[in-house]
From Swiss-Prot:
Keywords annotated in UniProt: Coiled coil, Intermediate filament, Keratin
The species this protein was found in: Homo sapiens
Listed name of the protein: Putative keratin-87 protein
Gene: KRT87P
Gene3D superfamilies per record: 1.20.5.170, Single helix bin (1.20.5.500), Vasodilator-stimulated phosphoprotein (1.20.5.1160)
Pfam families, alphabetized: Filament (PF00038)
Subunit structure: Heterotetramer of two type I and two type II keratins.
InterPro entries recorded: IF_rod_dom, Keratin_II
Length: 255
């Protein structure tokens, strides 16, 4: 009986150790899952910020492109107006020079005045045209540089978004694996707990049955001894001896 009780206690301790191991593994898996979920939330926040920044930059690119197109059209229109103005001035000079009057001095003076006006107008127009051209070129260069930097930043954001998307997918995969591991640990823990409870119930039942069997054996032995005592008491010389032996045997069996 002592050996059987020791074996049952050993099996019970083993089952408890297995349960503790599953419990510890389950807690570790839950902690890993919480960490993965926090990382996923942080990565998703970075991706959202990157998408918003990309949208802003794309809007800026669109605005800059429209502004460059507008400046280009304005530049072409101003060139057309300047060319028309220069052409009109030349025509006026030709018309003035084409007059055939007898007053030579007046014609010469008027021609000189118109030549001076035409020269100054042409010089002013050319100067204004050159300044506008330089201003337009500087504006186009400036906006082109801004557009180039914006495109580079968009490309960098696209690469960042791709990297963050890959990290998010990796985090999702890890989270799925952790969820599967947690579910498996829960199933294994429940199975181990159920098995341990079954074994514990079996051990308790076996122990109870052993106690009942022992009690039955003791009663049967006592009945046998009592019947023997009753038979031997008929002989006075041997009655005391039988009583002593029966008490000693019962005491030893109970112990």
């Amino acid at each position: 009986m002592e050996a059987n009780s020791g074996r049952l206690a050993s099996e019970l301790n083993h089952v408890q150790e297995v349960l503790e191991g599953y419990k510890k593994k389950y807690e570790e898996e839950v902690a890993l899952r919480a960490t993965a979920e926090n990382e996923f939330v942080a990565l998703k926040k970075d991706v959202d910020c990157a998408y918003l920044r990309k949208s802003d930059l794309e809007a800026n690119v669109e605005a800059l492109t429209q502004e460059i197109d507008f400046l280009r059209r304005l530049y072409e229109e101003e060139i057309r107006v300047l060319q028309s103005h220069i052409s009109d001035t030349s025509v006026v000079v030709k018309m003035d020079n084409s007059r055939d009057l007898n007053m030579h001095c007046v014609i010469t003076e008027i021609k000189a005045q118109y030549d001076d006006i035409a020269t100054r107008s042409r010089a002013e127009a050319e100067s204004w045209y050159r300044s506008k051209c330089e201003e337009m070129k500087a504006t186009v260069i400036r906006h082109g540089e801004t557009l180039r930097r914006t495109k580079e930043e968009i490309n960098e954001l696209n690469r960042m978004i791709q990297r963050l998307t890959a990290e998010v997918e990796n985090a999702k995969c890890q989270n799925s694996k952790l969820e599967a591991a947690v579910a498996q640990s829960e199933q294994q823990g429940e199975a181990a707990l159920s098995d341990a409870r079954c074994k514990l119930a079996e051990l308790e039942g076996a122990l109870q049955k052993a106690k009942q069997d022992m009690a039955c054996l003791i009663r049967e032995y006592q009945e046998v001894m009592n019947s023997k005592l009753a038979w031997t008491l008929r002989s006075p010389p041997t009655g005391a001896c039988w009583r002593a032996r029966s008490r000693g045997c019962v005491r030893a069996l109970v112990l």
